[in-house]
Amino acid sequence: MSYTDPDDSLPEHVPGEAEMSAQKEAILKQILEPQARMRLSNIRMVKPETAAALESHLINAASQGRLAGKISDEHLKQILQSMQKPRREFKINRR
């Protein structure tokens, strides 16, 4: 009878995820001004999927060299607005 260590059954990708998360945070810290980082963390608390999409967009832009300098809070707002789906407006006319 052989004994199997319960720790062996843990997935191997957990340390990799922590490293990727740390790398992502380091990159975002380099490309975002403090106010923009604060806004991104607030968005992450409310809408994690939007924050993840925004983070990947920013990291891709930075890796392709499309960013000139750090991103300000105002620029981050513009990027967010461009990423959002257009909303329909309904007008109700009363007679």
UniProtKB/Swiss-Prot annotation:
Coiled coil region boundaries: none
Region feature Disordered, mapped onto this chain: 1-21
GO cellular component, one term: cytosol
GO molecular function, one term: DNA binding
Keyword field: DNA-binding
Family the UniProt entry places it in: Belongs to the PDCD5 family.
Name recorded for this polypeptide: DNA-binding protein CENSYa_1764
